[in-house]
Swiss-Prot record:
Domain of life of the source: Bacteria
Presence of the UniProt keyword Disulfide bond in the record: no
Gene Ontology cellular component terms for the protein in this record: cytosolic large ribosomal subunit
Molecular function terms, GO-annotated: rRNA binding; structural constituent of ribosome
Region (Disordered) residue spans: 124-143, 258-297
UniProt cross-references to InterPro entries, sorted A to Z: Ribosomal_uL3, Ribosomal_uL3_bac/org-type, Ribosomal_uL3_CS, Transl_B-barrel_sf
Family per record: Belongs to the universal ribosomal protein uL3 family.
Protein name per UniProt: Large ribosomal subunit protein uL3
GO terms for biological process, alphabetical: translation
Length: 297
């Protein structure tokens, strides 16, 4: 088992090399610090306590500050245990590179709070008839309906009734890791995860232990745009390039074609100037000959 703590940034969409659109959740995964290590001999189970996202010391009590000092780190805002995770020592950093593209993970977070909600929204019940006696008075369209038989004398537990909706811990299983960006501490996960923007998340390897999927081949939008621009430039200078080439190869070929075109234009200009000068000399000679002929006459 392996896991890491992160923060939800939001959702976006990316494109594969085949042109398919993939909805992903962007999770910021800053390096986590191992703040405590649980062992079988001492605690009865194996786990690592991870801490992420710095917080001011004045918001913590002295015992809590001392707990973080044991791992030689600053107080952390989000601290959670990852069961059955081992291989790290106190104070070590856990980074996003523990996951790879194509792996399946379980993401746990606190769902969005919806407040007090009726049974239609809370339990997806059917709306009542809007005619034949329904839709007003003693029979509103969105009423709860039956909550038990007349002889029961009580309401059984588990009946779908109005109440508080959301703001509870939820886990979505088997989400695919699309991309791991170590440089920016970003994890892209396919699909949606529980909670609003900026909520804290626990990302763990899938408990169902399903096989990893083939990594999605993504397209680099900036690179694709630059290649299109280079293709247009190649048409202008008559260079032969293809999309399969690397950018620096395309630039070298286009640069060589541009130099060749400039050279040809320069030669054409010089030839034109030479031709014009020859015409001027010829005209001057004809003029002198004509003057001589006029004097001889």
């Amino acid at each position: 088992m392996k896991g890491i703590l992160g923060q939800k940034i939001g959702m976006t969409q990316i494109y594969t090399a085949q042109g398919n659109k993939v909805p992903v959740t962007v999770i910021e995964v800053k390096p986590n610090v191992v703040t405590h290590k649980f062992e079988n001999t001492k605690d009865g189970y194996v786990a690592l306590q991870l801490g992420a996202f710095d917080q001011k010391e004045r918001k913590f009590k002295k015992p809590e500050i001392g707990h973080f000092k044991k791992s030689n780190t600053t107080p952390k805002r989000f601290v959670k245990e990852i069961r059955n995770m081992d291989g790290y020592n106190l104070g070590d950093l856990v980074k996003a590179d523990i996951f790879k593209s194509g792996e399946l993970v379980d993401v746990t977070g606190i769902s969005k709070g919806k407040g007090f909600a009726g049974t239609i929204k809370r339990h997806n019940q059917k709306i009542g008839p809007k005619s034949h006696g329904g839709g007003g008075g003693s029979k509103p369209v969105r009423q709860t309906g039956s909550i038990g038989d007349i002889a029961g004398n009580k309401v059984l537990k588990g009946m779908t009734m109005p109440g508080h909706l959301g703001n509870v811990q939820r886990t979505i299983q088997n989400l695919e890791v699309v991309k791991v960006d170590i440089k920016n501490n970003i994890l892209l996960v396919k699909g949606s995860v529980p909670g609003p923007k900026n909520c804290f998340l626990i990302i763990k390897s899938a408990i169902k232990n399903l096989p990893s999927r083939e990594a999605i081949e993504l397209v680099n939008i900036k690179e694709a745009i630059l290649k299109n621009q280079l293709l247009e430039s190649a048409k202008k200078y008559g260079a032969e390039v293809s999309v399969d080439m690397k950018i620096h190869e395309m630039e070298e070929i286009i640069h060589a074609a541009m130099k060749e075109k400039e050279k040809l234009e320069q030669e054409a200009k010089q030839n034109a100037e030479k031709s014009n000068s020859d015409d001027d000399v010829r005209k001057e000679a004809e003029k002198l000959n004509k003057n001589k002929e006029d004097k001889g006459e």
